[in-house]
């Protein structure tokens, strides 16, 4: 799916890591929320409250989940899961990484 229909979008962006990650919150009619964003080339660490599924829309990244030793690579069309109350490192190298973060 390349678009979301019948949603509310928060106008003001969520800006993290001095602008290296920028996203917008999208709320669906059933109350569920997702964020749609871009990470510029960098290596960042994110903490999670709720479980997350990170869907790769464009670009590529490498990810290391908390407690793991190895990095795993993801490209457009792939996703990875992060448990609640955890963290992950993400490395974006060549071009911006476009994603949808599915919460819960």
From Swiss-Prot:
PANTHER family, A to Z: PYRIMIDINE/PURINE NUCLEOSIDE PHOSPHORYLASE, PYRIMIDINE_PURINE NUCLEOSIDE PHOSPHORYLASE
Enzyme nomenclature, EC number: 2.4.2.1, 2.4.2.2
UniProt source species: Thiobacillus denitrificans (strain ATCC 25259 / T1)
Keyword Secreted: no
Catalytic activity line of the entry: a purine D-ribonucleoside + phosphate = a purine nucleobase + alpha-D-ribose 1-phosphate; adenosine + phosphate = alpha-D-ribose 1-phosphate + adenine; cytidine + phosphate = cytosine + alpha-D-ribose 1-phosphate; guanosine + phosphate = alpha-D-ribose 1-phosphate + guanine
Keywords attached to this entry: Glycosyltransferase, Transferase
Pfam families: Ppnp
GO cellular component terms listed in the entry, alphabetical order: cytosol
Role noted for this protein: Catalyzes the phosphorolysis of diverse nucleosides, yielding D-ribose 1-phosphate and the respective free bases. Can use uridine, adenosine, guanosine, cytidine, thymidine, inosine and xanthosine as substrates. Also catalyzes the reverse reactions.
Name of the top EC class for this enzyme: transferase
Domain of life according to the entry: Bacteria
InterPro entries per UniProt: Ppnp, RmlC-like_jellyroll, RmlC_Cupin_sf
Protein name per UniProt: Pyrimidine/purine nucleoside phosphorylase
Keyword DNA damage belongs to the record: no
UniProt gene name: ppnP
GO MF annotations, alphabetized: guanosine phosphorylase activity; purine-nucleoside phosphorylase activity; thymidine phosphorylase activity; uridine phosphorylase activity
Family designation: Belongs to the nucleoside phosphorylase PpnP family.
UniProt-listed CDD domains: cupin_PpnP-like
Signal peptide range in chain numbering: none
